[in-house]
A protein has these predicted regions:
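Charged helix-capping and loop-helix junction motifs
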Residues: 104-106, 135-143
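Short acidic, glycine-rich surface-loop motifs adjacent to enzyme active sites
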Residues: 118-131
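Histidine/lysine/aspartate-rich catalytic loop segments that bind and position anionic ligands
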Residues: 58-115, 119
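Long, charged amphipathic helices and adjacent flexible linkers at domain junctions
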Residues: 44-64
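Extended, charged alpha/beta regions that create polyanion-binding interfaces
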Residues: 37, 42
Length: 194
């Protein structure tokens, strides 16, 4: 079954009908059970991760990857954080097309004000799998940075979620950590997100 799907990760993101189609010995009932089990596991992982502080872009990737990297349309969301960088809630901002999504800074910042968030992380996926930022991504990041300063809300990062490749299991781009390394503020024992 895993071999037919290509990988366990690919299998986990298939609909029940797709699972039944790739394996002749599995009917719709068993395929639906498998699909439900994968979804339950993904939800349990997100719940566990949501209790821990989000300190690095890798933490963002770990939290969002099961929900975002297999989406076929660009999806923009914000992770609202408290003063200890724990997740208050994720908020979906927009769903776009295969290669773009429209998000305005006011739509991105509105949930931070409504939910009284200390800060936020902007995130979106690239359905192509390549997390390299586009010029549009660069411009949006700069506009959101400027607007968040005016509102006094901490814009902690913009993370683009890609898909795993042959050379890396965690494929993402972070505007604050372009190399993906865990950076610390100069002279302090805390991560950049704090």
């Amino acid at each position: 079954l895993i071999q037919s799907a290509g990988s366990l990760d690919a299998l986990a993101h298939m609909e029940a009908a797709e699972i039944a189609n790739i394996c002749k010995g599995i009917g719709m009932a068993k395929a639906a059970t498998l699909s439900a089990a994968f979804e339950l596991g993904a939800r349990a992982l997100r719940e566990t991760l949501s209790r821990q502080p989000i300190q690095t872009p890798e933490d963002v990737y770990d939290y969002l990857t099961t929900a975002m990297r297999w989406k076929e349309k660009e999806t923009v969301l914000v992770l609202l954080l408290d003063t200890k960088c724990r997740l208050i809630k994720p908020v979906e901002i927009s769903i776009g097309t295969l290669n773009e999504s429209i998000a305005h800074p006011r739509d991105i910042l509105r949930p931070t004000v409504i939910h009284n968030a200390y800060g936020f992380i902007l995130a979106h996926n690239h359905p192509s799998g390549n997390p390299a930022p586009s010029r549009t991504d660069d411009l949006l990041t700069e506009r959101v940075r400027e607007c968040s300063k005016l509102l006094g809300v901490r814009f902690l990062d913009h993370v683009i979620i890609g898909k795993p490749t042959e050379t890396t299991n965690k494929n993402y781009y972070s505007y604050n950590h372009p190399g993906g390394e865990r950076l610390k503020d100069p002279g302090q024992e805390r991560t950049l997100y704090h």
